């Protein structure tokens, strides 16, 4: 038996699927273009790796804090801001004229990605009843793997014929569709399950700093600096967990 979807459900599914496709597609396609980007900006291997690392650092470190902000202020609101940041970041990256600008733009994109991924699945679980969630979550996960699969092929194709900058412009049509749906009447509701609760700024800062230290430490091993960063990250996570256990409105519950 096929369950008839309301416009709200259909719009939410399209928004989640398209946005879940975007980041993996861009990430895997950019990896193909790294040698050409490195040659254009005369970047060594370490600096070149930061095109990917900077994005992943921002996306990973901010995932939990943005998830909490979405619970307090509304998942749709945070998601919408995220897709705007991701899209603007893509345009800025396409016009970057130095390695520094390129890496900063990727950090900006990572911030948007964190806002998208911290809310996308949560929006689906808010819109769809329990008996439908397995199917829609499966579709959503499928879009992630589709992005990873198609990224290298189309990334190579676009880079060869239109240049590496086209990779970032190519995602804009999907982003525009997502933004239009978010602004439409089909996407009713904001889904703020912790509305009115306090956001733990101190805990968030400690968490973000610890995650950045951990990821940076792993990337710099076996250097002494890498080991020190790892140690700082572990201490930071321990401090974060102790702090969160003692407050009434934790970032991670």
Positions of PLM-derived features:
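Primarily residues marking transmembrane-helix entry/exit sites
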Residues: 6-17, 99, 200-205, 209
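Helix-loop-helix hairpins in multi-pass membrane proteins, especially solute transporters
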Residues: 67-202
């Amino acid at each position: 038996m096929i369950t008839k979807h309301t416009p709200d459900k259909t719009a939410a599914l399209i928004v989640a699927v398209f946005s879940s496709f975007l980041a993996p597609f861009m990430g895997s396609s950019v990896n193909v273009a790294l040698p050409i980007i490195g040659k254009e900006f005369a970047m060594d291997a370490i600096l070149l790796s930061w095109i990917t690392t900077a994005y992943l650092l921002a996306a990973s470190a901010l995932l939990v804090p943005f998830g909490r902000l979405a619970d307090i202020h509304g998942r749709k609101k945070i998601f919408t801001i995220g897709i705007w940041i991701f899209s603007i970041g893509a345009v800025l990256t396409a016009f970057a004229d130095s390695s520094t600008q390129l890496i900063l733009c990727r950090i900006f994109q990572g911030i948007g990605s964190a806002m998208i991924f911290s809310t996308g699945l949560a929006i689906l679980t808010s819109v769809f009843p329990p008996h439908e969630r397995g199917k829609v979550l499966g579709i959503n996960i499928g879009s992630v793997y589709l992005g990873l699969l198609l990224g290298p092929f189309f990334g190579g194709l676009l880079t060869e014929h239109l240049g590496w900058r086209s990779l970032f412009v190519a995602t804009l049509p999907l982003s525009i569709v997502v933004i239009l749906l978010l602004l439409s009447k089909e996407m009713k509701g904001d889904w703020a399950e912790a509305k009115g609760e306090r956001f733990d700024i101190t805990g968030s800062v400690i968490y973000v700093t610890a995650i950045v230290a951990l990821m940076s430490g792993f990337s710099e091993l076996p250097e002494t600096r890498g080991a020190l960063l790892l140690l700082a990250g572990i201490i930071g996570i321990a401090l974060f967990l102790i702090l969160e256990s003692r407050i009434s409105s934790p970032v991670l519950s």
